[in-house]
């Protein structure tokens, strides 16, 4: 990879394409504050330098907003989506939609819920057969995430799951990092979502930790994990849900 001069271009405010977030999301005061991050990045982009694909050439493709046809499979990448709230400080992510044989798989990437209402609406409108959604970051409740933001993420997560009506919905990543996640997102789970561990026929690790602690086996299991003995069978374990036979 190598540095190159910046390309000329326009950088419209991404929030302009999110009408529901503007209406239902964070207050205008907060948005003005957060928008400064975006404007600061625009100045950096305009001044450069940028990174080229360098010696990788055609092997590296920037996927933002692109569609790829690979045999009978179509892979669609979204335009950049906020990594959380409007103008989120971690930046942007790309969601992916894969279509093959009349079936559709949607991977949300790291939307933290989604927090943004328009993203929940988009997921529902895609109506995938299989949905993998990262879920709200309930473990950040408190000083690292405002209650209003978490409530928004939980609400929009439920909207996405209910609206998509996917045959299989796997809700994981952020959500399963603390033991109270099921109660926080009961609407999404009531609509049929399962965790990644449950897709493998196992309880989530947070549940297993609670069980081991109650049985006085927590230290033993931690030592097994350190020795690489815990769940060593997982690479060869099949899914407990049928994704291929959709």
Label every PLM stretch briefly.
Residues 103-107, 130, 168:
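Structural motif
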Residues 127-137, 166:
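Proline-aspartate-enriched helix->loop->beta-strand connector
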Residues 5-118, 205-246:
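Core dinuclear metal-dependent hydrolase active-site scaffold
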Residues 135-138, 198-200:
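Short, acidic/turn-prone active-site loops that include or flank metal/cofactor-
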Residues 149-246:
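Binuclear metal-ion centers of metallo-dependent hydrolases, dominated by the metallo-beta-lactamase
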Residues 120, 143-147:
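Short, solvent-exposed loop/turn segments at secondary-structure boundaries
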Residues 85, 112-117, 137-142, 175-180:
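Active-site environment of divalent metal-dependent phosphoester hydrolases
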Residues 115-127:
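Short amphipathic alpha-helices and their capping/turn segments at secondary-structure boundaries
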């Amino acid at each position: 990879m190598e540095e190159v001069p910046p390309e000329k271009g326009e950088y419209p405010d991404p929030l302009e394409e999110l009408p529901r977030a503007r209406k239902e999301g964070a207050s205008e005061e907060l948005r003005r504050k957060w928008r400064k991050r975006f404007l600061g990045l625009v100045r950096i982009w305009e001044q450069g330098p940028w990174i080229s694909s360098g010696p990788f050439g055609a092997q590296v493709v920037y996927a933002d907003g692109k569609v790829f046809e690979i045999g009978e499979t179509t892979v669609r990448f979204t335009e950049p989506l906020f990594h959380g709230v409007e103008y989120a400080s971690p930046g942007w992510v790309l969601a992916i939609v894969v279509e093959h044989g009349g079936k559709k798989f949607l991977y949300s990437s790291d939307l933290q819920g989604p927090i943004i209402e328009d993203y929940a609406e988009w997921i529902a409108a895609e109506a995938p057969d299989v949905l993998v959604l990262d879920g709200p970051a309930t473990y950040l409740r408190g000083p690292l995430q405002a209650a209003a933001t978490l409530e928004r993420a939980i609400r929009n997560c439920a909207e996405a799951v209910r609206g998509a009506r996917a045959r299989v919905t796997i809700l994981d990543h952020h959500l399963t990092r603390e033991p109270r996640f099921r109660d926080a997102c009961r609407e999404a789970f009531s609509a049929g979502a399962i965790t990644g561990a449950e897709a493998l026929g196992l309880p989530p690790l947070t549940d297993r930790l609670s069980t081991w602690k109650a049985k006085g086996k927590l230290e033993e299991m931690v030592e097994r994990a350190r020795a690489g003995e815990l769940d060593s069978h997982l690479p060869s374990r099949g899914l407990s849900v049928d994704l291929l036979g959709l």
